[in-house]
């Protein structure tokens, strides 16, 4: 079920507070977050947010083209190790 246009985008409160605090000070710092479900909003542009992928925090620089997407879209959680090689000797 998709979100309707009349609903506001979800942003975690702790993340929003940190970004507003940095914007008022005019500082740039890496913000760590576990909230992958938060939507990127225009006040986040220019900040670097370290998004947790289940193992570590991956730093992502927010640009204007990312607005409207979720933070989790920019930190992949699975590492593809490649397909298994065809090992006929072990099958015998």
Swiss-Prot record:
Keyword Cell wall biogenesis/degradation: no
One GO CC term on file: chloroplast
Record-linked SUPFAM superfamilies: Ribosomal protein S19
PROSITE patterns according to UniProt: RIBOSOMAL_S19 (PS00323)
Molecular function terms from GO: rRNA binding; structural constituent of ribosome
Gene Ontology biological process: ribosomal small subunit assembly; translation
Subcellular location: Plastid, Chloroplast
UniProt keyword list: Chloroplast, Plastid, Ribonucleoprotein, Ribosomal protein, RNA-binding, rRNA-binding
Gene3D superfamilies in alphabetical order: 30s Ribosomal Protein S19, Chain A
Pfam families: Ribosomal_S19
Predominant subcellular localization, coarse grouping: plastid
Role played: Protein S19 forms a complex with S13 that binds strongly to the 16S ribosomal RNA.
Family named by the database record: Belongs to the universal ribosomal protein uS19 family.
NCBIfam families on file: rpsS_bact
Protein name: Small ribosomal subunit protein uS19c
Gene it is expressed from: rps19
